[in-house]
């Protein structure tokens, strides 16, 4: 069941009014319009008449009115205009991959003086504009320990974390995890910026191939291993859609030096790792090379260029870390998309307009059919500042209500009739204030960015449209960043550095609803891991080594015809192909013989008329792990006698003592000379019991007689079948009801003797 939480309205839309129900910005702009427009009117009127003067005044004042009134995504007109001019005219649009080391050519002698002058002027105008693909990547230096110097005084670090079980839990357990996630979001103070990166990136085909590789063993089954590996590869491509999920948490702060930054970041890192582990989330801090590898994958989405990097090569080659991760080129020549190498991309932001959201919203956003990157930049607002801001908003709303009531009185209609938005904003603001003051909530400023990619423009637009439909179903909007594609994409790199000023104020509980967890992935990277299928929640492969789990046992259940036997046979085959383990099959329906024989195993048919014999008294020195094989064998023989005697009565102490006394006697000859001919059989035990003087010995011997001299003497023979093969199947279909339980017990014991 989905868990819903309410989302407060965006109170940043409520502006503080000063005079005439106008904001400070509007008063300044209207004042400037009047100061410039009115003198222009009188000046032009003298020479061109009132009509021309009026037109002139209107043309002069309209831009100021637009600056005062127009706003998009919380950004005023002059900011939007600045972004347009920079993207269209000042910043370099095409940026090729170009190294700038000691081996690079510093000057092209064929350049003319005019070309040099034009280039110089362009560089002067675009002082901060990157000229190459490397310069476009917005960080200064990456250190070995994972700390990145992003700007002169800003440093960041990154933690990688994995999924955990969530979607299939009960509602109360989900609510507890949501509370823990909300508390985790409050871990960062207002001086720390943090960024969640949820990436669906193309799988590393070589790495996936190595993970699913099955080494050959020259045991006659290598052809099956090749087929099995091919099957695994096909399942991996269809199940994961060729994508791999990478989840990162990056955090950064201002510091005067690297030493100060390292001390602060390591302290935060320890708190973050401890908190995540308490939530049963696997997390690890990644080093500089791993951060570079992740960025390389982001910057090379769609191509198969491998990341090859060595810290020692930096000094030898004169290159920088950016030279190892940069794409072949960047092209930011369009306002609503960009090109990275041969692939296209588009950055959008999530406009959260819904009144409530459920805990599966992020999962649905991330359930992509193509590569995409979702990023949440979060900045905590100081509690006192947040309360002050909300109180000011409530004051503005109350002032607006008073103005509306005055209008109602003048207009002669009911003063209780208020605009819907005004009433809703007022309720939400008071609710938010109460949450901040009484419910231990914090106010967070969130920037939610999503990068879609495609090999062609059409594919890109299809991917964006598909995501937009999902977003609209949640009563939210996916809005493309206009003329901020570069800043948007660079903000999605795991550097905890946000260049987009579009923010949404949310409480910790409403931010926590964007919880990423679904179900813990089970993918053991050991040679003994076996393919079990596809997780129906995560749609990922389940490849597990059961011996590494806390409870390695398994039970296959299902209705008739659902494939229980098929699944069992599949796992048996996988065990033989991928591990060194032995397989022992107890077959009550005689259905596994063809498979066992095909895999080179041994089938043993056990019944009253069979000539395949198993001696229940077989023993060897490996029978017990504690160097007491006879003691363990005695326990087995006593269990066998309890089944032979039948009924609800168990053997008493006297009967146990009789059997325990006889067992060492029948094994003396074998231990003196351990050859198969000296191994005792049930008849030897029967004869030894008859030698005992107690009355109860006679009872034990009489019960055993049926299995020694009677019609059920199938187990009174020495073993004549090969039990050393890796796969042994015991066919007990025709064993009969009288021997069924005894046969099952003996089969269980054989696994100790034959190994």
State where each predicted segment sits.
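P-loop NTPase motor domains
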Residues: 141, 147-151, 157-166, 171-192, ...
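Hydrophobic anchor at the beta1->P-loop junction of P-loop NTPases
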Residues: 556
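Conserved lysine of the Walker
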Residues: 564
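Short, charged cytosolic
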Residues: 1-11
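The conserved Walker
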Residues: 548, 560
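Hydrophobic alpha-helical transmembrane segments
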Residues: 46-61
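Extended, folded cores of ATP/NTP-driven motor/assembly subunits in large transport
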Residues: 57-61, 65, 73-78, 89, ...
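Hydrophobic positions on the alpha1 helix immediately C-terminal to the Walker A/P-loop
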Residues: 567
């Amino acid at each position: 069941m989905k868990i819903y939480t309410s989302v407060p309205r965006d109170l940043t839309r409520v502006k503080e009014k000063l005079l005439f129900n106008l904001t400070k910005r509007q008063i300044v702009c209207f004042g400037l319009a009047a100061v410039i427009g009115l003198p222009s009117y009188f000046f032009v009127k003298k020479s061109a008449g009132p009509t021309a003067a009026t037109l002139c005044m209107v043309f002069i004042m309209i831009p100021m009115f637009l600056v005062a009134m127009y706003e998009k995504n919380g950004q005023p007109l002059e900011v939007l205009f600045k972004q347009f001019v920079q993207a269209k005219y000042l910043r370099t649009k095409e940026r090729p991959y170009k190294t700038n080391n000691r081996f690079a050519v510093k000057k092209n002698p064929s350049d003319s003086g005019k070309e040099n002058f034009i280039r110089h002027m362009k560089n002067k105008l675009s002082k901060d504009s990157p000229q190459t693909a490397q310069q476009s990547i917005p960080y200064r230096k990456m250190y070995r320990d994972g700390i990145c110097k992003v700007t002169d005084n800003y440093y960041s670090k990154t933690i990688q974390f994995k999924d955990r079980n969530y979607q299939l839990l009960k509602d109360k357990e989900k609510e507890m995890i949501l509370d823990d996630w909300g508390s985790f979001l409050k871990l960062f103070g207002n001086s720390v910026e943090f960024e969640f990166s949820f990436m669906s990136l193309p799988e590393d085909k070589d790495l996936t191939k190595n993970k699913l590789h099955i080494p050959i063993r020259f045991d006659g089954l290598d052809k099956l291993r090749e087929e099995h590996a091919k099957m695994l590869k096909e399942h991996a491509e269809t199940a994961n859609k060729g994508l791999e999920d990478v989840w990162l948490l990056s955090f950064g702060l201002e510091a005067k030096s690297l030493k100060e930054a390292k001390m602060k970041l390591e302290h935060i890192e320890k708190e973050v790792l401890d908190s995540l582990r308490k939530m049963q989330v696997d997390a690890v801090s990644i080093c500089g090379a791993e951060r570079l590898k992740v960025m390389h994958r982001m910057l090379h989405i769609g191509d198969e260029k491998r990341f090859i990097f060595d810290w020692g090569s930096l000094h030898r080659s004169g290159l920088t870390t950016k030279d190892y991760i940069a794409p072949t080129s960047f092209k930011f020549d369009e306002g609503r998309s960009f090109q990275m190498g041969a692939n296209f991309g588009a950055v959008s932001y999530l406009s959260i307009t819904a009144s409530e959201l459920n805990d599966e919203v992020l999962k649905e956003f991330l359930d992509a059919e193509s590569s995409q990157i979702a990023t949440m930049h979060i900045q905590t607002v100081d509690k006192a500042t947040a309360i002050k801001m909300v109180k000011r908003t409530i004051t503005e709303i109350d002032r607006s209500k008073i103005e509306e009531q005055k209008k109602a009185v003048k207009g002669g209609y009911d003063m209780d009739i208020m605009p819907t938005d005004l009433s809703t904003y007022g309720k939400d603001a008071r609710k938010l204030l109460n949450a901040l003051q009484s419910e231990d909530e914090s106010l967070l400023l969130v920037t939610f960015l999503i990068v879609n990619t495609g090999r062609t423009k059409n594919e890109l637009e299809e991917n964006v449209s598909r995501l937009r439909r999902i977003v609209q179903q949640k009563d939210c909007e996916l809005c493309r960043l206009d003329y901020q594609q570069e800043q948007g994409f660079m903000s999605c790199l795991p550097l905890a550095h946000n260049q987009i000023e579009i923010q949404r104020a949310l409480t910790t509980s409403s931010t926590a609803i964007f919880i990423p967890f679904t179900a813990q992935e089970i993918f053991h990277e050991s040679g003994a891991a076996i393919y079990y299928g596809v997780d129906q929640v995560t749609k990922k492969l389940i490849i597990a080594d059961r011996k590494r789990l806390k409870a390695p046992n398994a039970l296959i259940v299902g209705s008739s015809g659902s494939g229980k036997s098929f699944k069992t046979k599949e796992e048996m085959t996988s065990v033989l192909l991928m591990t060194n383990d032995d397989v022992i099959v107890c077959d009550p329906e005689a259905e596994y013989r063809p498979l066992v024989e095909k895999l080179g195993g041994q089938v043993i048919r056990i019944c009253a008329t069979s000539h395949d014999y198993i001696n229940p008294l077989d023993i060897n020195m490996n029978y017990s792990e504690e160097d007491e094989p006879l003691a363990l064998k005695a326990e087995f023989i006593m269990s066998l006698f309890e089944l032979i005697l039948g009924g609800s009565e168990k053997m008493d102490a006297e009967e146990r003592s009789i059997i325990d006394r006889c067992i060492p006697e029948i094994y003396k000859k074998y231990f003196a000379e351990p050859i198969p001919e000296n191994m005792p059989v049930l008849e030897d035990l029967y004869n030894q019991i008859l030698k005992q003087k107690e009355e109860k010995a006679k009872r034990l011997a009489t019960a055993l007689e049926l299995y020694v001299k009677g019609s059920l003497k199938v187990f009174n023979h020495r073993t004549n079948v090969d039990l050393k093969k890796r796969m042994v199947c015991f066919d007990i279909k025709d064993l009969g009801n009288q021997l069924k339980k005894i046969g099952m017990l003996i089969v269980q014991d054989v696994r100790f003797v034959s190994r």
